Amino acid sequence: VLGFAAGGLFDGILLHQILQWHHLLSLVPGVAGLREQVLWDGYLHAFMYVAAGIRLAGLWRARAQLEGKRWRSLVGILLLGFAAWHTIDALVSHWWLGIHRIRIDSPDPLIWDLLWLGVFGLVPAIAGALLLRKPPSDPRRMRSGRAILPLMIATLALAAW
């Protein structure tokens, strides 16, 4: 839940506020005014803050049980949640409901949707899954596993180019 909330906050703050590429309901008829768009963005952010706060409180309460746990597990779960936000946002908001796209002003918004999904959905999901894997006992396997992420990033960059 914490990674999911972080993904929603990252998306909302970067895309809605800083870059201003879209708002939550940019493509919804009848929600055209900037004031209304920003209001709905605020509702999304408030929901994400509440979700993050609840999860942080849960982590605080469970801190004694978490002592000695591997940091890899926590970071891996956070990355999977972050990736889940971007994957669900792309599938539901962009393609199923059609309430917004990553770059509305683009002549081909699908390219931006796919690039965003790859960089902030696929890459964190792979990194999170790799962190959650049991470390291999053979050091040669460990080195080959480390090479997968840079290769995936290079492949996505070439595909986008």
Region locations from a protein language model:
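C-terminal TM-helix exit segments that contain a strictly Trp-centered aromatic cap at the helix terminus
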Residues: 6-17, 82-96, 157-161
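Hydrophobic cores of alpha-helical transmembrane segments in multi-pass integral membrane proteins
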Residues: 1-13, 43-56, 81-86, 122
